[in-house]
Amino acid sequence: MAITMKTLIAYVFTVLLIISSVHCRMTTTTSPGFGIKQQDRQCFEHAPYLCRGGEGDCRMYCRDLDFSFGTCFSGVCCCQI
């Protein structure tokens, strides 16, 4: 059975489509290189005093609330969920 030009072109386009689909797929949150996503932290704007003396108070505050850890972002204490 001979491969016709139409079949060959259809095969090539199919392969290219599959390769580009696999290559350009969305990355997941478990992929390396991702930092803390915005929805993965809880920020407490009502307590700016937690970041005035460094991040120590913010970390203790977050640990007291059973978060993993805390850090200051733009003067606001944010805890990782």
Swiss-Prot record:
Its main location: secreted. One of its GO terms (biological process) is killing of cells of another organism. GO terms for cellular component: extracellular region. Disulfide bonds join 43-79, 51-72, 58-77, 62-78. Residues 1-24 form the signal peptide. Keywords: Antimicrobial, Disulfide bond, Fungicide, Plant defense, Secreted, Signal. It is found in: Secreted. The keyword Secreted applies. The keyword Disulfide bond applies. Belongs to the DEFL family. This is Defensin-like protein 107. It comes from Arabidopsis thaliana (Mouse-ear cress). The lineage of its organism: Eukaryota, Viridiplantae, Streptophyta, Embryophyta, Tracheophyta.
